[in-house]
Regions:
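An N-terminal JmjN-like helical accessory module and its immediate linker preceding a catalytic domain
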Residues: 1-59, 441-442
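Cytosolic ligand/metal-binding cores
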Residues: 10-14, 23, 146-167, 260-333, ...
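A residue-level signal for conserved active-site and pocket-lining positions in enzyme catalytic cores
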Residues: 24, 58, 107, 136, ...
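A short, Trp-centered hydrophobic/proline-enriched beta-strand micro-motif
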Residues: 30-39, 105-106, 208-211, 237-244, ...
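Short polybasic amphipathic segments
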Residues: 33, 63-70
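Non-catalytic accessory segments adjacent to catalytic cores
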Residues: 37, 71, 78-217, 398-401, ...
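An anion-binding catalytic pocket shared by soluble metabolic enzymes
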Residues: 45-59, 209-298, 314, 319, ...
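Conserved hydrophobic core element of enzyme catalytic domains
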Residues: 338-442
């Protein structure tokens, strides 16, 4: 057992016979989560994080946050602006672990009056976070598994990490399960085309980029984890997530990080421009050149990078905001993505949540043209102040017996609307097809 501070305890075990999925299946408890990095994604993160049995939950709707304490069973209501309340309520505990996340909040957030998932048939909070004192870290580089517990209350008794280690090494798992779904409703291409064309015609100096949701709804029966496993196998990405809430499960994959904060270092990796991988190395390189040389994509990407720079300058020392990598082609299993990396130094009086607010909000402190539309992000806010959120690009929410699927479409004045529609239609068909498992569709 290693002690890193009076409140933080760690235990490291050999994980060469384990996987994040196996650990998750053996882990006992409620409100479990799994944040994975894809080993098949170029530049993917080193760690995956697993947890269960949160200490408390924060659920924000409008200008109110409900705090549910699982220790006392009591619910507290806090009134005020969402990010102001989150900064006040999120526990901040210094520790010296080498991991980017060693305990804290896991969940999702939208902006303004919208939720992370835009669908009138499902009501989700504007923000929903579980706070975990105990988490499990899987190191993909060393195959080590580290169990970490951080006490929110200094006087609270420490849990038995030896017992937890035995649970994930020798614990029982249930038999493999399956799922079935039956599509019910979808945004029609005709109506979506009308929306896209109308929005593009109204782009101007104040609104230069639009993020729009396109949704599908289906009946769902079976195991939500089986659905996630099928998704991660067929569509690996830099970010993969599965989070259980009281009455719904959020799962999905995303190639795009929204924002990361590590101490005073702020990192954004905007992504704009995607094309399929080639079947051979030569075709892959040909697709890469075509993506890189496409003028409309480069213009849209440059516009996005400029917008993100301005957003970061509102929360960082302005002179510190630099484009470290410009228009780099990044590879995932199925696609090529054009990304840039922007870094800055956080202003000392600000919180990591101020950075999230600046980058997810359509109206930050700058006068630079902003984004219109609806989207959200999912990730963690650590006790140590670190933060990492991914855009919830292609997400699934399972609520009761209904599966809500949503994709987000980004458009600028340089976007070819017809190409976007063809791409969306193809992605939808491919996305639904890859979910078919053991006769998954009725």
């Amino acid at each position: 057992m290693q002690t890193t501070s009076s409140r933080t305890k760690m235990k490291t075990i050999n994980g060469d016979s384990l996987t994040p999925i196996l650990i998750f299946r053996r882990l006992q408890g409620k409100h479990k989560f799994l944040l994975e990095s894809s080993a098949q994604h170029e530049g993917a993160g080193r760690y995956s994080f697993i947890g269960a049995n949160p200490r408390k939950t924060y659920k924000g709707v409008g200008e109110e946050i409900q705090e549910v304490s699982y220790k006392t069973g009591k619910t507290y209501v806090h009134k005020g602006e969402l990010f102001v309340l989150l900064k006040r309520l999120m526990p901040r505990i210094s520790n010296t672990t080498q991991f980017p996340f060693s305990g804290g909040a896991v969940g999702y957030i939208g902006f303004g009056g919208t939720t992370m998932f835009v669908d009138k048939k499902i009501e989700l909070p504007d923000a929903h976070f579980h706070v975990y004192e105990t988490i499990i870290v899987f190191d993909h580089q060393t195959d080590e598994v580290t169990l970490i517990h951080t006490n929110i209350d200094a006087e609270k008794q420490q849990p038995d990490l030896e017992e937890l280690a035995q649970q994930i090494v020798n614990g029982q798992i249930s038999e493999e399960a399956s799922y079935r779904y039956q599509p019910l409703d979808a945004t029609t291409n005709e109506s979506f085309a009308t929306v896209l064309q109308t929005m593009q015609a109204n782009l101007h100096d104040d609104i230069t980029r639009v993020v729009l949701p396109k949704r599908d709804v289906a009946n769902f029966q079976g195991d939500t984890l089986a659905l996630y496993r099928q998704l991660r196998k067929k569509k690996p990405a830099a970010y993969l997530y599965y989070v259980e809430f009281e009455d719904h499960v959020v799962l999905g994959t995303s190639p795009e990080s929204l924002i990361r904060v590590k101490g005073e270092r702020v990192i954004a990796t905007p992504t704009e421009g995607t094309c399929p991988r080639g079947e051979t190395k030569n075709k892959d390189l040909k697709n890469e050149r075509q993506l890189y040389n496409q003028a409309s994509i480069r213009q849209s990407h440059a516009l996005l990078v400029s917008a993100v720079q301005q957003e970061l300058q509102s929360v960082c020392f302005p002179d510190s905001v630099q484009v470290m990598e410009a228009m780099r082609i990044q590879r995932s299993k199925k696609a090529l993505h054009m990304t840039s990396r922007i870094e800055g130094k956080l202003l000392p009086m600000l919180h990591a949540l101020d950075v999230l607010a600046a980058t997810i909000s359509p109206s930050s402190a700058t006068e630079f043209p902003h984004t219109a539309g609806n989207f959200g992000a999912l990730g963690f806010i650590g006790f140590n102040g670190h933060l990492d959120f991914a855009l919830t690009g292609q997400s699934i929410v399972i609520n009761q017996d209904t599966m809500h699927m949503q994709s987000t479409i980004t458009m600028t004045k340089y976007t070819n609307v017809q190409n976007v529609l063809q791409k969306v239609q193809g992605e939808e068909q491919a996305f639904l097809q890859l979910l078919v498992n053991n006769g998954g569709r009725n």
